[in-house]
Amino acid sequence: MGWNEAIKLRSASLPALCLLYVTCALDASGAASYAKEAVITETAGTVRIAADSPRPLEQVLNALQSKYGWIVNYEDPQYVSAVDVIKASSDSQVPSGGSFTFEFSSAAPDEGKTLRQLVDTYNKSKNPGHFELRHTADGGFNVVGTAGHSDKGEIVEQQAPFDLALTLSNKEQTIDETVTRICAEVSRQSRSNVVLAISPRKILFQNRVALGGNKVAARELLSKSLGATHGKIYWRLLFDPESKNYYLNLHLVHGV
């Protein structure tokens, strides 16, 4: 998929994207008995985070960010089997996540150790997807979906879209154009389209970056692009079981 085609897909995907947002909003509001956000309690030296969401692991990461300021990128695997997908209250398909509880010591928790424990605990639960914790060169963390279930309930390995090695000519563009170009190249090489959805558009349009590389992981290119904003931006790469598209949501951390 070329850059122009990616722009067209981005525009054409807006109606489906709006439907996806509405579905998520309905689910989060309790129409499908999901919680809007995870509940955090702390007793007897133990922190307990109770999530209830189609994507409970992401909800726990959001709670950890709220409590400790830990900024962690999150990427869905593909939810394609009957085991990993259910009908939502709006009659659209969503990941089949639900209740998930994570507990850890409240005594000066270490970010890396706690995140490792979180991912290991999640992978042992009955919730959809299988994840890995990845360290970044700058000391950050990515939680990456690397597997889903088959219709028989077996774990099937998948290639994470942002693991793909990209070759891009060095070109100076707005960061919005650069991220769209990365998404277009990932879409061209993978089985799913990746569409830039939510983002701090003003920042992405006002800042420019000269970026390229030979066989560089898409995740690294994306991270470098966002770093050029001189702000703190994290991402959520969410797979939509209805359209089979990935939607890349970029969020600006304020006050950092």
For each feature predicted by the language model, list its residue ranges.
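N-terminal targeting/assembly segments of extracytoplasmic apparatus and virion spike/baseplate proteins
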Residues: 1-256
